[in-house]
Each structure stands twice: as structure tokens, then as C-alpha cells.
A protein has these predicted regions:
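N-terminal, Lys/Arg-enriched amphipathic/low-complexity engagement segments
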Residues: 24-25, 31-35
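Phosphoinositide-binding peripheral membrane targeting modules
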Residues: 67-70, 75-76, 85-121
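Bacterial signal peptide processing site
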Residues: 19-22
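Hydrophobic helical h-region of N-terminal Sec-dependent signal peptides
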Residues: 6-11
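C-terminal motif of bacterial Sec signal peptides marking the signal peptidase cleavage site
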Residues: 14-17
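Positively charged n-region of N-terminal signal peptides that target proteins for export
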Residues: 1-4
Length: 169
């Protein structure tokens, strides 16, 4: 009898602990739940659809390597539909440019721009391609309702790389 009671007690603790929390904490420490999360997601979606936002990098995660925390501010910014990025690149390059800076540097209007809002998972996904004279970048940006997200960049001449940071407008 004692073991059954102990088992039920432990089982109820596990169920309570695994219930999860639907509270999201934003970058500035605010806790959002329910309606606030939906409003924040709509605000982020609006910023992205209007083409006016800045994604600020907090850490860089090269494929097959440990995270790197840059001491300089790197951003992907969109202003009036023009996307600009100057980002560090750590990883394998399959074609090195002589005298180049080695980073990911682009400016222009995105091609194949696709914005998808997933209200069930509280995130916005942005996919686009940027063609530069010497390189093409396929960019995927996923932002959650807490304004924190992941940006992954794929190029035919480099290994994929991910950047973690937050979005602001």
C-alpha cells in the first residue's frame, strides 16, 4: 500500500512538472502569456511584413563548432524593403576571395521573400534569397513571440552558419 501511494505521489509530481509553462519571457524581462503573446507575435509579423526591422546577433554557431559570442554588434537590418547584413563568418569556405573580408556582407532587395506566421508555435518564419555579384545567400529567420530568434544562412560556397539574437523595430 505504501509503495502504491509513493508511486502515485511521484507520478503526480512528474505530470505536474511536465505540464510546461505557456509563459514566454522577452528580452527586456517581461513575461507574456496568452493574449500578450498573440499581440507580440502580431507586432513582430507587422515589422517584418513592413520591411522595417533589425536582427541583432548575440551569438554565432558555426556548423560543427562551439558557439562564439562576438564582442562587436552585427546585424541584419531591413529598411523599406532593402536588406543589409554585415555578419562574421566562422567555418569552411569552399571558394575564398583574394583580399576579401571573409564575412557575410550583402545589401539588396530579397528574392523569393516568404513570410509565414505559425500562431500555434508562436513564431514567424522568414525565408529569402539574396544574390550578390559573387555569391548567393539563402536566409531563414525564425523569430518567437519573445523577440528572440535564429537566423541560418546557406551559401553554395560556404558551410551553413546560424546566428542567434533578437529582433527590434
Amino acid at each position: 500500500m505504501r509503495t502504491i501511494a509513493l508511486f502515485l505521489f511521484i507520478f503526480s509530481l512528474i505530470l505536474t512538472g511536465c505540464g510546461g509553462s505557456s509563459v514566454i519571457t522577452t528580452e527586456d524581462g517581461r513575461e507574456l502569456n496568452g493574449q500578450q503573446q498573440r499581440e507580440e507575435l502580431e507586432r513582430i509579423t507587422s515589422m517584418i511584413e513592413n520591411g522595417n526591422f533589425t536582427f541583432t546577433v548575440q551569438s554565432v554557431n558555426p556548423q560543427g563548432s562551439s558557439p562564439i559570442y562576438p564582442s562587436t554588434e552585427y546585424t541584419l537590418s531591413a529598411e523599406d524593403g532593402t536588406y543589409r547584413a554585415y555578419l562574421p563568418y566562422f567555418g569552411r569556405s569552399y571558394r575564398a576571395e583574394y583580399g576579401g573580408n571573409g564575412g557575410i556582407d550583402f545589401e539588396g532587395e530579397p528574392e523569393e521573400l516568404e513570410i509565414e506566421t505559425n500562431r500555434r508555435r508562436n513564431k514567424v518564419t522568414v525565408r529569402f534569397t539574396i544574390d550578390q555579384p559573387d555569391e548567393q545567400y539563402d536566409v531563414t529567420l525564425e523569430i518567437g513571440a519573445g523577440s528572440y530568434g535564429t537566423m541560418t544562412i546557406i551559401s553554395p560556397y560556404r558551410r551553413a552558419i546560424s546566428y542567434y539574437g533578437n529582433i527590434s523595430g
